[in-house]
From Swiss-Prot:
PANTHER family: COLLAGEN ALPHA (PTHR24023), COLLAGEN TRIPLE HELIX REPEAT (PTHR24023:SF1082). Residues 1-26 form the signal peptide. This is Collagen alpha-1(II) chain. It comes from Xenopus laevis (African clawed frog). Residues 1252-1486 form the Fibrillar collagen NC1 domain. Contains mostly 4-hydroxyproline. Prolines at the third position of the tripeptide repeating unit (G-X-P) are 4-hydroxylated in some or all of the chains.
Amino acid sequence: MFSFVDSRTLVLFAATQVILLAVVRCQDEEDVLDTGSCVQHGQRYSDKDVWKPEPCQICVCDTGTVLCDDIICEESKDCPNAEIPFGECCPICPTEQSSTSSGQGVLKGQKGEPGDIKDVLGPRGPPGPQGPSGEQGSRGERGDKGEKGAPGPRGRDGEPGTPGNPGPVGPPGPPGLGGNFAAQMTGGFDEKAGGAQMGVMQGPMGPMGPRGPPGPTGAPGPQGFQGNPGEPGEPGAGGPMGPRGPPGPSGKPGDDGEAGKPGKSGERGPPGPQGARGFPGTPGLPGVKGHRGYPGLDGAKGEAGAAGAKGEGGATGEAGSPGPMGPRGLPGERGRPGSSGAAGARGNDGLPGPAGPPGPVGPAGAPGFPGAPGSKGEAGPTGARGPEGAQGPRGESGTPGSPGPAGASGNPGTDGIPGAKGSSGGPGIAGAPGFPGPRGPPGPQGATGPLGPKGQTGDPGVAGFKGEQGPKGEIGSAGPQGAPGPAGEEGKRGARGEPGAAGPNGPPGERGAPGNRGFPGQDGLAGPKGAPGERGVPGLGGPKGGNGDPGRPGEPGLPGARGLTGRPGDAGPQGKVGPSGASGEDGRPGPPGPQGARGQPGVMGFPGPKGANGEPGKAGEKGLVGAPGLRGLPGKDGETGSQGPNGPAGPAGERGEQGPPGPSGFQGLPGPPGSPGEGGKPGDQGVPGEAGAPGLVGPRGERGFPGERGSSGPQGLQGPRGLPGTPGTDGPKGASGPSGPNGAQGPPGLQGMPGERGAAGISGPKGDRGDTGEKGPEGASGKDGSRGLTGPIGPPGPAGPNGEKGESGPSGPPGIVGARGAPGDRGENGPPGPAGFAGPPGADGQSGLKGDQGESGQKGDAGAPGPQGPSGAPGPQGPTGVFGPKGARGAQGPAGATGFPGAAGRVGTPGPNGNPGPPGPPGSAGKEGPKGVRGDAGPPGRAGDPGLQGAAGAPGEKGEPGEDGPSGPDGPPGPQGLSGQRGIVGLPGQRGERGFPGLPGPSGEPGKQGGPGSSGDRGPPGPVGPPGLTGPSGEPGREGNPGSDGPPGRDGATGIKGDRGETGPLGAPGAPGAPGAPGSVGPTGKQGDRGESGPQGPLGPSGPAGARGLAGPQGPRGDKGEAGEAGERGQKGHRGFTGLQGLPGPPGSAGDQGATGPAGPAGPRGPPGPVGPSGKDGSNGISGPIGPPGPRGRSGETGPSGPPGQPGPPGPPGPPGPGIDMSAFAGLSQPEKGPDPMRYMRADQASNSLPVDVEATLKSLNNQIENIRSPDGTKKNPARTCRDLKLCHPEWKSGDYWIDPNQGCTVDAIKVFCDMETGETCVYPNPSKIPKKNWWSAKGKEKKHIWFGETINGGFQFSYGDDSSAPNTANIQMTFLRLLSTDASQNITYHCKNSIAFMDEASGNLKKAVLLQGSNDVEIRAEGNSRFTYNALEDGCKKHTGKWSKTVIEYRTQKTSRLPIVDIAPMDIGGADQEFGVDIGPVCFL
């Protein structure tokens, strides 16, 4: 219901209320001290009271100042006989006319209920605003004209507006005496009583008639209708006091009172309910690696996996081991002695001979597979310093150097007054994250996580235990003697006999077959090149060899002609899902996407390290003409008189025209941190920012734990080939899991890498001897023989790739104290201090040099796709892709033309050994041969084959341990032992042997069948191949013809003693036996005749062991024993002795870039380099942290008026509102237009003109805002510095003004001298003089500087500011003034009598010159470092004349912290005739 206020007024009023709060809050203290009341015509008014001293004048009290304004009446042309009511100013139409002319009666609202007011007479309140006229009374006599009011200030002339249309007469005004107008404005006219709800509008007024003469007083008329409110008339004489009227209706609620002081804290409330789950926080920094966890409990046994798909057929296995020995056959008939057999087959190969001498160096092998990339090496040593560069061009003058070292500390000053406790500082920058705290207790059981990915295949289970040996069968009855059995296996090695006497050298044996191939020895030294041998004779053609291994695929043939299109084949079955491809490397960055919307500002990061200095930029363009230089030194004045007292302030000049708006004020101090706001709703997802540059490679992560094994899923469809993923980091090795149950046999795997060498297994029990198999076909090449003896140490190999850096070993014992080290490097910069106050902008610097290339930023989010770029150059050939699914069968192609025969392929390198094939089926039994013709009786044979094995003798005594047998085959690896403690890092090992060849590649598709080639020439004989594997047994051949007698075979091994045979015919003398051990010497008996053999005696006791016989021939190689059970893991061995120092290896490859070392000491400054080319524009950086709050902006333009709101409920009564200054309306008027004709009819409400007291309050408010924007340097409205005053009021003269550099409350403003020519702010000293007298009597003859304030009795340090302000006020304000200034200066006048102040004319030097002490305790001298030296503008104290003279000293600096001067130390004092005094000039800041 603010219908009577212009919408522009409302907007301004609302805006200014906010400003008023800021202005008034600080002035509350002043209002309490000085109530700001006003007195006019002897009447006292409170601050912000509004009254009318005359009917046509309205005044407001504005903090002690009375502001009055004339009331201007609108002409009422439609009212012929308008009347001015008593006490009003403006004429109104009589009510009878309005009622008749309007044609409608004015409705009157219901009368309100009388208020419940106690009859207590209070003090007289200030007059309320004009109430509505009472009902028509009898007309009183005209009162005398009141005294003329004081003339008001002249207002500005407004431009004449276009006349508006006449408005209708408004309804009756609001009810009378309420509170002051501010309460009405807040509450609105929402009362139920009175005429506030009259909705009927008056008709237009008639034309105004001539004023008639006053008629005679009529009889009192009847009670008239309530009239419109009249303008204030001239006051009549006061009538007698009428009877007390009935209580009026309650006034409208006033404005809300000011907030009371905060109440005491309430008791702590009960804890609130559990809040909703918060949004996830930002990810924390990676924690420190935790302790190694304890091994987890064994998991429950998993369910049996689904049956695997049927595996492909395995490769053919190796020939099976010979079967067990068959049962003993029935004894055959005794045959006749046969004829001598053919020469026996070649005996088995002897044991491998000792390792031969190293062969000549073979040709260089094919290059090995590339090794895995080594980890980056350690940083290389710093290179030698390069040669001195050429002299560069002369650099520009450098920036001023840093201040020199502090001078010797002065004598301690007297204790200062303790400063007031400072306000608590703003929060510092967030510290870096702390170290991880101690390990917390285990948390509660978390929710079950989602199913993890399928784990990797577990390690193979431990080999099963060997089955128990079956029970021994019963001994069968001895059968009749069978044919001589085959030679038994070599018996267990007997106890080691004593060495026998050396026998005679035997005849040389036949050359043994080549032994198995030994492991390659280490490379021998290269031998001299041998002479070329003669070409051998071509050998005979051998029989046709078996099929060779398939050759390597030949070179591709020429493309054949296109075949006929075949008919499409049926679609093949769905292929298995291929394995996921390895993660590919990151693709190249895509083209830049369109500019995304600006993202939300990020969280403020920790401060980054200081970047390297950038390169100097290009020289800037020529600058504008500089500002006029500093004021020159004054010319020699005459002698300055002593300073006179300050003159009285001159009369205030006329107020000048309003200056242009001043610049924004300096930035205020940061406010105290606000209380945390409520959490905002989560914002919408921001548009992804631009892609950042690729980040640096992160550190290698730890290996993750293997996940639980998932159950087998159903077979998926063939997926499309995935994009190459990024390579994942290796997780740490998981703890060994428990052995799983043996799984079903899987298909054969690829050939694995060789396992670690297992510990020697326990010897297995000796196997039974198998039947002798038939000789197999020639086998494939044998496996490598056992490793040969270690060769001589070869030359040092090339450096291997650097291994990964091992974990740090345990700390060694502390070393002995070393010699004192060189001075350390300069430490890193400390953390940045809290943000200072913003200084004034400096002058533009020269462009800097181009900066170093920055480090790559972290990888940004992928940008939106950019426009299609041009096609790139073809990339390098990518790796072969995974085989795609089998395509549908193509149509039959036409027959191609016969291709050219391909070139003969190169002989392929032999492929790796194939997996052993499965055992072949046993061959069928050969046919029984026909019985041979009975031969003639042969010559007596040699000693018969040994008979069958006799029964076992009694066990012999335990022999000495035999020599170590050859190592058994590697047993299966035992279970993982517990981790030992970490050993000391060993020395680097020797270079390992060449690695095993890689896995076989996939088979190529078979080539087309080539045509038969023509016979080639016979090739030279190839080298002897290694013996092949034993082939399957062939069928027995046909029975051959009896061969001719062969040469006698070699002696067979001595058989075990058989049962005694029946007496045979006398044989030929046997071969001489080996000499037996010498028996005890007996009498030589005669040889008796050979008796007939008696019956078989019982088995005699075992004779004593004979001397060890000569070694028998090498027996056939036994079958491979079964793998022994795995031995337990042995204890860790003792640490070996340190080996000899190895030869130095060749230099390793370059290591990783080391961490940046600490900065070295600054080198000598090099000559400036040439100016580099200007760099490209950098990409937009990421949003910086939120800066400190900027300076307060200018007030915004007045916004458009809003629609009228709903009427609010009546508020509680408020205190009297503040006054308002009417001059605000000067800013509202529009110069081009007159007033809006409908300006008082905004909400279809009738209204009179704008209430005058609103205008008055606005005018007062406008003055206060203007003072904030353009301070006038008074104590009530101080400026920040004199420079601000000069900018706001350039026409003002130099003089004393008030400033408040630290802003805030104005109580601590200080009075200074403002030099309006230069804008300098000069603070007076207090006191400003040291009286002239003899201050010091020297005790010794030595003269030294004596500090006046510190040493001289009665001396004092100089202080500044006036006595009226609180102590330290000037010091606090000067601290801020220094921050706001860039230059400072001060003059000191030294009055002397027989005392040197500056130059000593007698000696011509400055040794006796006075010292000055700056406010930061620095000493300012007459000579020395130019930044700490003062000048003498006038020097009259050069010699002792017996008269008073003076020297004027000036010190100027851009280090504002050095001024003002706080003490002076003369040297040439102490004599009885030596006197001095000082005038301390003001310190001036600019």
